């Protein structure tokens, strides 16, 4: 995949981490060039135009191995995910968990997912196993991504896979509210 200037700039922002100089660039492991901020990992077959760094001793390529029992999830559009981020802003939350898979109860930081979709635009599928295992992203090319899931408590706000704002502990009646951001569904006690 030939990387655009915008994708390279986004990767430069990811590898700019003053707390971890060993990740301020890309490094080679196995057949892949890897860029990471320790919350998301990007795997490239061809070396991006970024400086080389020390990297880490942990084998990050092993994270791409998924068991046969893993669930494959078709990803929503990037526009949908940007909308999820906007809902988090409307709720005055920096991070609002997005329910990537309701059956497996896997939640993800929507900001990291949008970033993954922008850096790897051909990514169409996520593979997950449990709420605590890394989520692997792949598409049509030879590049991959991994995002570590969010731990989500059963009683806190989240956005479900249909884009609805859910507040599980406040009852069951759903009321539509209009605000300056957009129409948001919330759950209120009865």
Which stretches of residues belong to each language-model region?
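DNA polymerase processivity clamps
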Residues: 1-190
């Amino acid at each position: 995949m030939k990387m655009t200037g915008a994708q390279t700039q986004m990767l430069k922002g990811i590898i700019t981490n003053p707390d971890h100089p060993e990740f301020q660039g890309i490094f080679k492991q196995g057949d892949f060039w890897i860029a990471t901020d320790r919350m998301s990992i990007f795997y490239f077959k061809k070396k991006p135009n970024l400086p080389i760094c020390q990297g880490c001793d942990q084998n990050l390529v092993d994270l791409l191995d998924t068991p046969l029992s893993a669930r494959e999830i078709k990803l929503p559009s990037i526009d949908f995910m940007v909308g999820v981020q906007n809902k988090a802003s409307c709720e005055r939350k920096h991070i609002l968990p997005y329910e990537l898979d309701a059956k497996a109860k896997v939640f993800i930081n929507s900001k990291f997912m949008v970033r993954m979709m922008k850096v790897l635009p051909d990514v169409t599928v996520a593979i997950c196993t449990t709420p605590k295992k890394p989520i692997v992203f792949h598409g049509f090319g030879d590049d991959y991504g991994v995002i570590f899931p969010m731990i989500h408590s059963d009683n806190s706000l989240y956005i479900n896979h249909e884009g609805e704002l859910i507040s599980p502990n406040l009852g069951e009646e759903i009321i539509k509210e209009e605000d300056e951001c957009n129409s948001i569904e919330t759950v209120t006690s009865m």
